[in-house]
Amino acid sequence: MDPVIIAFCCYQUGYGAADLAGTSRMQYPATVRIVRLPCTGKFDITYALRAFQKGADAVMVVGUKKGECAYETGNLKAEERVRFAKQLLDELGIGGDRIDMFFMSAAEADKFVSAVNEMTARVEKLGPNPLKAQ
């Protein structure tokens, strides 16, 4: 099974880390789809719900390190939304473990790769998105 993971990345840090991982030829699963956001503070729970509805197996939200958000508190707002999304996904029977928030700087390509590998391993244990069977 090749799990599909949607990574919502802030332009300043998360996307920079993903880009650096790519230009450094670091290896991570090719089934990760990156959606660039101006800031993770722009992330909305409906983005995750739509991703799961369309067949994603997991969602990552990748923002700046705490205290280093270019928009001051955007990453903290996203963290709250992800926490709520976890509860909602549990209630819906999809599973809150299918979404997580990661914090890193643009220079931490290795941390991006580790986060992707962590989510991939998690999805392999959980199995495919239960909505795919419907």
Curated annotation (Swiss-Prot):
Transmembrane segments: none annotated. Its cofactor is [2Fe-2S] cluster. InterPro entries: MvhD/FlpD (IPR003813). Its EC number is 1.12.99.-. Keywords: 2Fe-2S, Electron transport, Iron, Iron-sulfur, Metal-binding, Oxidoreductase, Selenocysteine, Transport. It is an enzyme of class 1 (oxidoreductase). Binds 1 [2Fe-2S] cluster. GO terms for molecular function: 2 iron, 2 sulfur cluster binding; metal ion binding; oxidoreductase activity. The F420-non-reducing hydrogenase vhu is composed of four subunits; VhuA, VhuD, VhuG and VhuU. Belongs to the MvhD/VhuD family. This is F420-non-reducing hydrogenase vhu iron-sulfur subunit D. It comes from Methanocaldococcus jannaschii (strain ATCC 43067 / DSM 2661 / JAL-1 / JCM 10045 / NBRC 100440).
